[in-house]
Amino acid sequence: NKSDVLEYVALNGKPMELFDVIDEDGNKTGQVKERGVAHRDGTLHSTVHIWIVRPNQESGYDVLLQKRSECKDSNPGSYDISSAGHVSAGDELMESALREMKEELGIHAREDQLQFIGTHRGQFEAEFHGKPFRDNERSTVYLYREPVDIKNLKLQESEVEEVIWMDFEECRKGIVDGTLPNCIYEGEFQMVGKAL
């Protein structure tokens, strides 16, 4: 019954982000947690990751990376997946992926343009802005191969500082040897490489 669904919550006039708590297989447990609480407690939740790729002149691929805004609650100023975001409580994976691309980059993609390549389990603990942060996510990973001109993107300033194209192999090396400031899981990046 749609009338029994909590659709909006605010605290001091600021909208709160709610996540469905999930099990290891990605099934919703029926519990919902607020974003900050989920990240404080290390609660398992869903995210969507969209990797935008293009062929390059070296017969390889370039990957579009976004540089996270300095005001992000985790990994500020780090290079990250082309477009990524949490799945809000009650939302589906594909609608979340399409929404994130539109909100962060201004790309109006269609469902048939996203290629599902797998899921990735990511966990880490750190401290950002003086607060503990325990991420525990199950990411649904997609490739997007449509032409993208970064000059035409409309970046969400609160989320994304800039975007750059980087050669896939150069990016892989930067992730592995730590020369690229990033928050990319090496295992997920390998998954992308296998799908190219």
Name every feature range the model reports, one short phrase each.
Residues 3-6, 11-14, 77-79, 83, ...:
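Nudix hydrolase/Nudix homology domain
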Residues 108-119:
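A short coil-to-beta-strand element that immediately follows conserved catalytic motifs
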Residues 37-48, 58-99, 103:
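Conserved Nudix-box catalytic region and its N-terminal flanking loop in Nudix hydrolases
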Residues 60, 76, 109-111, 150:
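Short secondary-structure junction motifs
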Residues 24, 68, 168:
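Residues immediately flanking
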Residues 13-58:
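Acidic, metal-coordinating catalytic segment for phosphate/diphosphate chemistry
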